[in-house]
UniProtKB/Swiss-Prot annotation:
It comes from Arthrobacter sp. (strain FB24). Belongs to the formate--tetrahydrofolate ligase family. Pathway: One-carbon metabolism; tetrahydrofolate interconversion. Signal peptide: none annotated. GO terms for molecular function: ATP binding; formate-tetrahydrofolate ligase activity. It comes from the Bacteria. Keywords: ATP-binding, Ligase, Nucleotide-binding, One-carbon metabolism. The keyword Nucleotidyltransferase does not apply. SUPFAM superfamilies: P-loop containing nucleoside triphosphate hydrolases. Pfam families: FTHFS (PF01268). It catalyses: (6S)-5,6,7,8-tetrahydrofolate + formate + ATP = (6R)-10-formyltetrahydrofolate + ADP + phosphate. ATP binds at residues 73-80. This is Formate--tetrahydrofolate ligase. It is an enzyme of class 6 (ligase).
Length: 565
């Protein structure tokens, strides 16, 4: 227990009583034939084996509640905590609810975050296993990615029948770890028997196109088709080369055949949760797997899900990428805001965020206002969830609620860290979300797919970020020409941008104006079905911080994890 006698997330999770996952599945209406046990408290669900109870009336798919946030502090603002707490409160109100979340990436767990399963009494369990290797999905995705690149390099070594140009590879090997030293490497050294030397590099697994394909596939057949469409490089004639050209989409699908099934776990309060897939929202599309979301909608009346980082990133990608693939457009959106994030955007230094400062709240409110207006552009008025921290004062919370009312949006303080787990800390938020679910709305995408790639990017940076315009580098302009030539311009755009600012400069907080977003490169993800626009200095292989969270982690003499926050 910590020095202030407040239990850590890990201590709370380890003291919680879990129900056997078979009981959770049965209570959620999942037939036993569809449940594949991974120990006592985890299971995979095979959607192909799900059956409706005999004699039960055909039910409509569940409504989606999307949880997003204002621009975060480095520690995050508690989207997962709020997602879990909200779902528990909806279940407490008698609603048939299920959660759909992303799986944590090991790199950030050992780096900055220390864990990513919610917090306090609003967590998904078993916390340690989910945060570490879970059911092995990320291992399978990493293996499929690296198998592809081993097969590509072997093809080049064995005679290169496809005429692949090693200088024009667009696909990298991956590792589920933050490791800056692997961003740029040279492979194939050591003589003729060791392969063809070429420049290469590693991305983090969550940035892999196979992760994106995994999370956007509708079933295993669609997964196989999407894998086949992946472009991994170009020929010497500058023609794209795909996985199908190499003929290994079947082998990659085989490596993912178990991983593609969603993982079932539970919250501290016993609410069922599907935790599956995990692309980052700053360098990928930031949403859990579509299969998990659709499975949850089949089983529950309300599905509470989240999209990574702020609404300018994860929520925009949910609306413009994920919701285009299948009918998962949200019926309600929750924007998580915190007093500390508003203060940071109001100019307060990180080491003084715990000090009361209503004036800084007012100065930082422009950031939250822009996120509110952004969500409204999709035809939905958000509900603001004020995620309460122990250092928040009543005056600060009252000011923020009054400010939200002045902006014309419903808001509620969510005390789900300390009063979650089936407690009443999220009851007011749940009531406002239920009202929002019944309110009329008219969902719309931010842009039509018929727009040019330049105009799609311009629309996003002007409408979502508040930028004056966009500047394309010379390499990006060359890539635009390739995209047009190859018939890929009809795909949506996935912006890769810092999560800390509306701009591509992480230091410009609040709601900056008078800036230009700089696109340094464009990467067509033809399997996933979107074009990644790399902006600013955002990296697809992060580095570890100066003091990694791993330094606080250990196990006791029984092997029980310590220090996972």
């Amino acid at each position: 227990m910590s020095d202030n006698n407040v239990m850590s997330d890990l201590e709370i999770a380890q003291r919680a009583t879990m129900r056997p996952i078979g009981d959770i599945a049965a209570a959620a209406g999942i037939n036993a034939d569809a449940v594949e046990l991974y120990g006592r408290y985890k299971a995979k669900i095979d959607p192909a084996k799900l059956i409706d109870p005999a004699g039960a009336p055909k039910r409509l798919p569940g409504k989606v509640v999307l949880v997003s946030a204002m621009s975060p502090t480095p520690a995050g603002e508690g989207k997962s905590t709020t997602t879990v707490g909200l779902a528990d409160s909806l279940a407490r109100a008698g609603r048939n609810v299920m959660i759909a979340l992303r799986e944590p990436s090991l790199g950030p767990v050992l780096g900055m975050k220390g864990g990513a399963t919610g917090g306090g009494y609003s967590q998904v369990l078993p916390m340690e296993e989910i945060n570490l290797h879970f059911t092995g999905d990320f291992h399978a995705i990493t293996s499929a990615n690296n198998a592809l690149m081993a097969l590509v390099d072997n093809h080049i070594f064995q005679g290169n029948e496809l005429n692949i140009d090693p200088r024009r590879m667009t696909f990298k090997r991956v590792l589920d770890m933050n490791d800056r030293s692997l961003r740029e490497v040279i492979i194939g050294l050591g003589g003729p028997a060791q392969g063809v030397p070429r420049q290469d590099g590693f991305d983090i697994t969550v940035a892999s196109e196979i992760m994106a394909v995994f999370c956007l596939a509708t079933d295993i057949a669609d997964l196989r088709a999407r894998l086949g469409r992946i472009t991994f490089g170009y020929t010497y004639d500058r023609e794209p080369v795909t996985v199908a050209d190499l003929g290994v989409q079947g082998a990659l699908t085989m490596l993912l055949r178990d991983a593609i099934k969603p993982n079932l776990v539970q919250t501290i309060a016993g609410t069922p949760a599907l935790v599956h897939g995990g692309p980052f929202a700053n360098i990928a599309h930031g949403c859990n797997s579509l299969i998990a979301t659709q499975t949850a909608r089949r089983l529950a009346d309300i599905v509470v899900t989240e999209a990574g980082f702020g609404a300018d990133l994860g929520a925009e990608k949910f609306m413009d990428i994920k919701a285009r693939v299948a009918g998962v457009a949200p019926s309600a959106v929750v924007l998580v805001a915190t007093v500390r994030a508003l203060k940071m955007h109001g100019g307060v230094a990180k080491d003084r965020l715990q000090e009361p400062n209503v004036e800084a709240l007012a100065a930082g409110s422009a950031n939250l206002r822009r996120h509110i207006r952004n969500v409204e552009k999709f035809g939905i008025t958000p509900v603001v969830a004020v995620n309460k921290f122990a250092t928040d004062t009543p005056e600060e919370l009252d000011w923020l609620l009054e400010w939200c009312a002045g902006e014309g949006v419903q808001a509620a303080v969510a005390d789900v860290w300390g009063r979650g787990g089936g407690g009443d800390g999220g009851d007011e938020l749940a009531a406002k979300v239920l009202a929002a679910l019944e309110a009329p709305h008219s969902f719309r995408h931010l842009y039509p797919l018929e727009l040019s790639v330049e105009d799609k990017i311009r629309t996003i940076v002007q409408e979502m970020y508040g930028a004056d315009g966009v500047d394309f580098s010379v390499p990006a302009l060359k890539r635009l020409a390739e995209i047009e030539k190859n018939g890929w311009a009809g795909m949506p755009v996935c912006m890769a941008k810092t999560q800390y600012s509306f701009s591509d400069d992480a230091t410009r907080l609040g709601a900056p104006k008078g800036f230009t977003v700089h696109v340094r490169d464009l990467i067509p993800k033809t399997g996933a079905g979107f074009i990644v626009a790399l902006t600013g200095a955002v990296m697809t292989m992060p580095g570890l911080p100066k003091v990694p969270a791993a330094l606080r982690m250990d196990v006791d003499d029984t092997g029980k994890p310590l220090g996972l926050f």
